[in-house]
């Protein structure tokens, strides 16, 4: 009888462990694989916004501004460009640190050609705004009476001229252009592909163009670089 009771107790314990394990696995699957709650979406927006990504309203509603901010985050972090906030993306956002510029200590703009991302800093060199860009495609073009290489120059520049609103150029329309080199500008454009597609200008989203223009007075330093071409401009501000 004692042996029978022990066997029965062991069987009941085994069943209880199996049920507990199954319930735990189901709960984990539900919490990890289910859709994000609005509070979690709002958390993702809030964290992105605090790091400098332009999310628009932080309200837990995934609109075009939120998607654009997420793509910019994914560009910077080297993640797959989906524009979707999944649970994996939320965890990546939670563990991310704010982007840091290559140069620090003074106000300037940096355009990272490899990431296709623009960083705008404050007077102390801390990043305040992060935007997606599309720069020169690197291909030869021929449009109307013009032809050339669609190239965004690397190096250090200064904003030397600005226009408000739209400006019609031989190669297209520029919205709130801030010129930095030989007619090339940082400007708004309705089309900002994930990859380099411009004739050489630095395209930014239309929604940010006016604000960015107002924050780039003539004389603002612009650093444009890829992995092999960074040049500091600290000596210009010493």
Q: What positions do the PLM features span?
A:
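Sec/Tat signal peptide C-region and signal peptidase I cleavage site
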Residues: 22-28
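Sec-exported extracytoplasmic/periplasmic mature domains
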Residues: 46-54, 71-79, 94-98, 123-126, ...
């Amino acid at each position: 009888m004692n042996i029978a009771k022990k066997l029965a107790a062991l069987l009941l314990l085994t069943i209880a462990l199996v049920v507990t394990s199954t319930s735990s696995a189901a709960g984990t699957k539900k919490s990890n694989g289910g859709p994000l709650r609005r509070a979690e979406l709002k958390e993702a927006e809030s964290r992105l916004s605090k790091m400098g990504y332009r999310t628009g309203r932080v309200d837990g509603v995934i609109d075009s501004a939120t998607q654009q901010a997420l793509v910019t985050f994914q560009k910077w972090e080297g993640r797959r460009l989906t524009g979707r906030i999944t649970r994996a993306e939320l965890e990546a956002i939670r563990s991310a640190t704010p982007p840091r510029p290559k140069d620090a200590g003074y106000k300037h703009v940096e355009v990272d050609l490899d990431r296709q991302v623009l960083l705008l800093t404050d007077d102390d060199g801390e990043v305040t705004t992060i935007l997606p860009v599309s720069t020169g495609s690197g291909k030869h073009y021929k449009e109307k009476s013009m032809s050339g290489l669609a190239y965004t120059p690397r190096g250090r520049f200064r904003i030397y001229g600005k226009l408000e609103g739209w400006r019609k150029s031989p190669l297209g329309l520029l919205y709130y252009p801030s010129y930095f080199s030989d007619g090339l500008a940082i400007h708004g454009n309705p089309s900002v592909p994930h990859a380099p597609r411009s004739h050489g200008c630095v395209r930014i989203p239309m929604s940010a163009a006016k604000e960015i223009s107002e924050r780039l007075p003539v004389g603002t330093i612009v650093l444009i670089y890829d992995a092999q071409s960074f040049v500091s401009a600290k000596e210009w501000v010493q």
